[in-house]
Amino acid sequence: MLYQQSYPITNKLLNASAAGSTSTASIIDGGCTLSKPGSGKTKSTTSLPSFNELLTSIPLPNEFKPSTKNTNQAAAATATSPYNYYMGPPAQHRLPTPPPYPMSSPTTATAATPLSQQSPHLQPQQTLQQPQPYHQQYYNYQYAAPPYPHPSQVPPPASYQQRHQQPMYQNTNGVPIIIRPSPGLITPTSTTFDHAKIRSNSTGDLSANSLALSSNNNTQSKDPRRKHVCKVCSRSFTTSGHLARHNRIHTGERKHQCPWPTCEARFARQDNCNQHYKTHTNGKNKRNRQQHRTLEASHVGTKYNTKSLV
């Protein structure tokens, strides 16, 4: 900052006023002019010091050099001053708005068209005065989904036979055109087939009807000696004994009992009973076998004694 003293200037001004001067006194200090109006008539003229005399009479700490650097520094100081933000007028910021989309495009907005779409060439002043609401800016990016057909207009799904039938021929202007059915998705209605039929269509085997006929032919073409057939499972046997033994499986009858005295196991087949009896009379249980013999002998002796007594 520049420092200057104004004592000589004030003394000269006081002397001029005491003399009754009615002229205008102007003092230029850093671009500022002070004027003192007087009466219309001038009684006496008093010469005032010039601007150069005032500058030379004021003691300055440094030399005063009028240059553009001081003005540039002052302008920079005023520009970078932290008080300019509060002293200046409030700045109006314009938010960036998305570009308007044409209404003829397939991706049209679902919400009502805002002001930016109605007049795409808006001026900055208009956008500042009429900002778009938040919900309108948000819905500008909401695009409509492709329209789905009405449920009544949806064609019914093609059946299994229609999708696998032979290609159809259609004449258009005398020219034959081959139309092949497109392989559609398998719907639940087309999957209600027999597993045997689906397997026959996929692997080339016989159909369900042919399988049933072949099963009947196999039963008739079996060995003619198997005349005895089970009534429950239709299994055939060569002898009636085999059939009777097989019937015990269905009835649950266990006619054969283990001959061991303390064992009460029963079996439907005799060979199974004999195999079980060997568990009691094997080589590891010789003592048990001897006991069994003694028990049998005692049992036979008691029977003989009872007979003799009778």
From Swiss-Prot:
Gene Ontology MF term list: DNA-binding transcription factor activity; DNA-binding transcription factor activity, RNA polymerase II-specific; DNA-binding transcription repressor activity; double-stranded DNA binding; RNA polymerase II cis-regulatory region sequence-specific DNA binding; zinc ion binding
Zinc finger map (C2H2-type): 228-250, 256-280
UniProt main location, coarse: nucleus
Disruption phenotype: Exhibits a high degree of filamentous growth and leads to avirulence in a mouse model.
Span list, region Disordered: 85-131
Keywords carried by this UniProt record: Metal-binding, Nucleus, Repeat, Repressor, Stress response, Virulence, Zinc, Zinc-finger
Alphabetical list of InterPro entries matching this protein: Znf_C2H2_sf, Znf_C2H2_type
Induction cue: Down-regulated during filament induction and in response to serum at 37 degrees Celsius. Expression of NRG1 is also repressed by RIM101 and under conditions that repress CDC28 expression. The bacterial signaling molecules indole and its derivate indole-3-acetonitrile (IAN) increase NRG1 expression.
Family annotation (Gene3D superfamilies): Classic Zinc Finger (3.30.160.60)
TM helices/strands, residue ranges: none
Cellular compartments annotated: Nucleus
Bias-annotated ranges (Low complexity): 104-131
Matching Pfam families: zf-C2H2
One GO biological process term: filamentous growth
CC annotations in GO: chromatin; nucleus; transcription regulator complex
Function: Transcriptional repressor that binds NRG1 response elements (NRE) of target promoters. Involved in regulation of chlamydospore formation, hyphal growth, virulence, and stress response. Plays a key role in regulating true hyphal growth, but does not regulate pseudohyphal growth in the same fashion. Directs transcriptional repression of a subset of filament-specific genes such as HWP1, HYR1, ALS8, HWP1, or ECE1; via the TUP1 pathway. Functions with UME6 in a negative feedback loop to control the level and duration of filament-specific gene expression in response to inducing conditions.
UniProt protein name: Transcriptional regulator NRG1
Source species of the chain: Candida albicans (strain SC5314 / ATCC MYA-2876) (Yeast)
